[in-house]
Amino acid sequence: MIDRSIQYNSRKDHLQMDTSFIKGVVVPILTICDKDEKIDEAKQRAQVDYVIKGGVTGILAFGSNGEFYMLEEDEMERGLKIMVDQAAGRVPVYFGIGAISTKKSCRLAKMAVKNGAAAVSVLQPMFLKPTYDELYNHFKTIAESVPETPMLLYNNPGRVGYTLSAKLVEELAHNVPNIIGMKDTSGDITQT
C-alpha cells in the first residue's frame, strides 16, 4: 500500500487522530485455512512473523489477498485476534472490509476496532453499482461508525466492476474527518 494519506486539518471539527503509522509497506496478508475452512492458527502466526521479519510497516488482514469473502464473521474475528496478538505492537494491523451492505460493513468495522485493528480499509460494494450519493453515504456511514479510527478507501475496479471517481474521493476526504487515505489498484494514473 502506497502512503497517499491526506489530512485536512483546516476544519474545526476534524478529529486529531494519530495517523503517523500509515506509511511504508503494508502487506495484504494471506489467510491460511485448513481443510475445514478454519484459520490455521500456527501457520497464520508464522506468516505474521515472517512478513514482520521481512521489514513491512503494517499488515492488512482480510484484504483481497486474504480472501475475506470466504470466511464467516466469527472466523474473521478470530483471525484478526490471532494477527493482532502475534504482531504484538511491532506493526499496526489494518482490517479489510469488503461487504456489500453498509450495515454489515459497519458491524465489521466496529468488530475490527474492538479487537485491536489500527485502521480499516473499505472496498467499494461489489456485484452492484451504487449511485454517487449511495456510494458517498455508504463510505460516510461506515466511517462514522468508527469515528476515532482512520479509514482508508480501497478502489479496486478489477474486483468490483467500477471505479471510485476522483470527485467522490475528494468530497469524502474533505467532509468525513476519519477518511484519511486510499489504496488505489485501478492502474489509472489520472486517479492519483
Report the location of each language-model feature:
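Active-site beta->alpha loop and helix N-cap motifs at the rims of alpha/beta catalytic domains
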Residues: 18-27, 32-163, 169
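Intrinsically disordered, low-complexity segments enriched in polar/charged small residues
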Residues: 9-12, 52, 143, 188
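Compositionally biased, low-complexity repeat tracts
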Residues: 7-9, 20, 59, 177, ...
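Catalytic alpha/beta core domains of metabolic enzymes, predominantly
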Residues: 145, 157-192
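Short, Lys/Arg-enriched N-terminal segments with co-localized hydrophobic residues
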Residues: 3-16
